[in-house]
Amino acid sequence: MPRLSEPSPYVEFDRKQWRALRMSTPLALTEEELVGLRGLGEQIDLLEVEEVYLPLARLIHLQVAARQRLFAATAEFLGEPQQNPDRPVPFVIGVAGSVAVGKSTTARVLQALLARWDHHPRVDLVTTDGFLYPNAELDRRNLMHRKGFPESYNRRALMRFVTSVKSGSDYACAPVYSHLKYDIIPGAKHVVRHPDILILEGLNVLQTGPTLMVSDLFDFGIYVDARIEDIEQWYISRFLAMRSTAFADPESHFHHYAALNDTKAVAAAREIWRSINRPNLVENILPTRPRATLVLRKDADHSINRLRLRKL
């Protein structure tokens, strides 16, 4: 069994120890499906899905069932009617981590696996990008240079959205963000209708504060972790690759980067990383890591080989 050398609220696993906890959980994901879920530059393969994500899906499945029993016990204490089994209280998962660390891929793979379980087939994934203030508002507040930092989000709207989902509303609407336009799409909405599980993915979703925060409504928190130096290199590599993908679109906000040669592209990416993404990671994102129920630690090759689970 995995052990820590001194008392701790966490238990740590290497990949071999963790994969043993899969038990008989079946792999219900094909290579073709995985290709569609894999982010640019990500190296995840079916073996990692089997050894890392299936045990995680099993753990969450068990916690969903336990959480519903807890809600039922509270309802009994209050003398309230038992909840409709077709409309359980949604189980909310937060997925946090730096830009370029692979948290979006983690969230998509987890969504695909959890939706395969008969007991919770309705799994919605929402990113916090939609809750960024529109560029016009960021300009008005002089925050364009702080885009992605906590103050650039409409945290009240995000809180209302998650509260609405968690409280069992018939539907809740999230704004939609366009990475192509680098802005909120006016009038576009992502409609969520009483899911069994909601996955909320974003840089700062585990953030705490002096008042009620969205992380206080989470049932499970995941932090995707790696060495800062490795994340920087992944960011630069992704930036270079995007010159021939997203940046190549004439409609892209970043189309002017598409024609840069390697030397200039690396310099541009490094400047963005060191002036924006690294400070945000160090000041705001990394300090939320202890809030996670599970930390997935990546090596330089993107593979997850160490995990830390909060047991208390």
UniProtKB/Swiss-Prot annotation:
Keywords: ATP-binding, Coenzyme A biosynthesis, Cytoplasm, Kinase, Nucleotide-binding, Transferase. One of its GO terms (biological process) is coenzyme A biosynthetic process. Its EC number is 2.7.1.33. GO terms for cellular component: cytoplasm. It is an enzyme of class 2 (transferase). SUPFAM superfamilies: P-loop containing nucleoside triphosphate hydrolases. One of its GO terms (molecular function) is ATP binding. It catalyses: (R)-pantothenate + ATP = (R)-4'-phosphopantothenate + ADP + H(+). InterPro entries: P-loop_NTPase, PanK, PRK/URK. Pathway: Cofactor biosynthesis; coenzyme A biosynthesis; CoA from (R)-pantothenate: step 1/5. Its main location: cytoplasm. ATP binds at G97, S98, V99, A100, V101, G102, K103, S104. The keyword Nucleotide-binding applies. It is found in: Cytoplasm. Belongs to the prokaryotic pantothenate kinase family. PANTHER family: URIDINE KINASE (PTHR10285). This is Pantothenate kinase. It comes from Mycolicibacterium paratuberculosis (strain ATCC BAA-968 / K-10).
